[in-house]
Amino acid sequence: MIKVGIIGSTGYAGAELARLLLQRDDVEIVWYGSRSYVGEDFASIYRNVAHRVSEPCRDDDMEELSKIADVIFTATPQGFCASKVTEDILSRTKIIDLSADFRMKDVDVYEQWYKITHASPQFIEEAVYGL
């Protein structure tokens, strides 16, 4: 069983990801991360999964999540994942980032495009982009 955490689970991409993962027998979602709905049941926000989910939404603590999840999905705006990821987190878990934080290999292009400073350029070279 693959233990998965989703940071940004109540946004459009995160909720769709949760819906898809809930259909798999080999995945257990152990963390529904949401800044807006901390403490509220995920199923009260998305009624279509009420019969399958009885977990509350938790905060966006990637450090804590990395201690219990095999894989962390971040379905968050640009800048979030890069600002949170550390070498310690990467030594414990895999991260699949749905934003563009590690999509572009050129930090200057990223910073020009998104108008933010990339917080973890040291991880760009080892990141893998998949579509």
Region roles according to the model:
Residues 1-131:
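N-terminal Rossmann-like NAD(P) cofactor-binding subdomain of oxidoreductases
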